[in-house]
Amino acid sequence: MIASSRLEQIEDAKEYGITLPMLLLRVPMLSEVPEVIRLTDISLNSEIKVLRALNEEAAKQGKHHKVILMADLGDLREGYWDKEEMVEMAVQVEKEMGSLILAGVGTNLGCYGSIEATPDKLQELVVIAEAIEARIGRTLEFISGGATTSLPRIFDGKMPERVNLLRVGEGILLAKDLDRFYGLDMSSMHQDVYTLKAEVIEVKSKPSHPVGTISIDAFGHRPTYVDRGIRKRALLGIGKVDYGSIDEIFPREKGVEVIGASSDHTILDIEEAAKDIEVGDILSFDIDYASLVYLTNCRNVQIVFK
């Protein structure tokens, strides 16, 4: 199964020839229901109005569309807070929406409210699933217990047995968060699968502190600067519009430091770079999950597979 929150990415995956089932990770917008049915096989849902629209559109397109109902277990993003309402909604989907297939239940933990995917939290989801199963008289296909933040429960053997689907992104794409934040040994994973490459467009020695009256930057912030004297700097032809924050990109070249950025420029301190850096050079950077999300959604960034 391939999953994305963006229908555009799902369409791209299909155009690349991927024939695996497609899951829409973000609950659908009402305005995109026709595309949800056209492009995806499964979607996460929490609103009766959207479910009815999906059912109607699936019938129009001659399809059966699977849905996973989302439970909010405290992270306070999407999902039913009232669990009795969720059970009744599941029964309604099962009995009254002939073009939808009630595939399972799911939850999100950690992405907004920073709530840990504890065994107790995940067991709450299992209890909801079993309440639904008792009402509809069959076993649900999926109990989806979160995303990368739920992987530690697999590593420590405390994942409830009935949880059989995780919507994992960072944990397989980069595998850095589990190491950094949870202390898990991820040495078996390649953590350098993605490389950001950017071209140097200027190299000059300049003061390290702006000269003049400091006001606000292009994003309305009032940064602080450290005066380190005259330093050799390089500009890159890429900026915050492309990757988000300078805190999420890491130069591979020794002695190179990212010191700032605007929308379309990134400023490096190269005074102590291990090698000479010239205009036209291509510099490589490691990236974190946030910058990966920005970069892969930016149409200005060329993505090369090797």
List where the protein language model places each region.
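Active-site-proximal beta-alpha core segment in soluble small-molecule metabolic enzymes
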Residues: M1-E130, R135-I136
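Active-site anion/phosphate-binding pocket segments in diverse small-molecule metabolic enzymes
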Residues: L122-K306
